[in-house]
Amino acid sequence: MQNPRRTKYRKQHRGRLRGISSRGNVVSFGKYALQALEPAWITARQIEAGRRAITRHARRGGKLWIRIFPDKPITMRPAETRMGSGKGSPEYWVSVIKPGRIIYELGGVSKEVAEAAMLIAAHKMPIQTRLVTSEKL
């Protein structure tokens, strides 16, 4: 699972998910990509589950690029704790995803293999996604 080695601040505000992705929304490395259609927080565990699914299905020959990184800490308070006494401690990490963001890219495999691998990975995601192809053929 991915998480930052060190951050400037341990805790962050939750923020809001507004607008569409202006960066990371074109296929840059591979030939096929999985693109988000909804805004969401995707956890490091979900990213890892998708990565495992794609690498298992693509086998050898395929190269995978993960275009998102979980850099936002999500804090949680211990169970049955009274209100007050500050913000909880960081529990897990998420990546903030806006519509249009490329999540995974895959190259070096056939279209059928890429479609099947991305479909399996899409089932691991908490959002609607679609398969996109690079225009440089």
Swiss-Prot record:
Q: Which domain of life is it from?
A: Eukaryota
Q: Where in the cell is it found?
A: Plastid, Chloroplast
A single Pfam family it belongs to is Ribosomal_L16
Query: What CDD domains does its record include?
Result: Ribosomal_L16_L10e
Print the keywords alphabetically.
Chloroplast, Plastid, Ribonucleoprotein, Ribosomal protein
**Which Gene3D superfamilies does the UniProt record give?**
Ribosomal protein L10e/L16
GO molecular function terms listed in the Swiss-Prot or TrEMBL record: rRNA binding; structural constituent of ribosome
- GO CC aspect terms: chloroplast; mitochondrial large ribosomal subunit
- Its predominant location is plastid
Describe its assembly: Part of the 50S ribosomal subunit.
Q: What is this protein called?
A: Large ribosomal subunit protein uL16c
Which species?
Answer: Adiantum capillus-veneris (Maidenhair fern)
Name of the gene encoding the protein in the UniProt record = rpl16
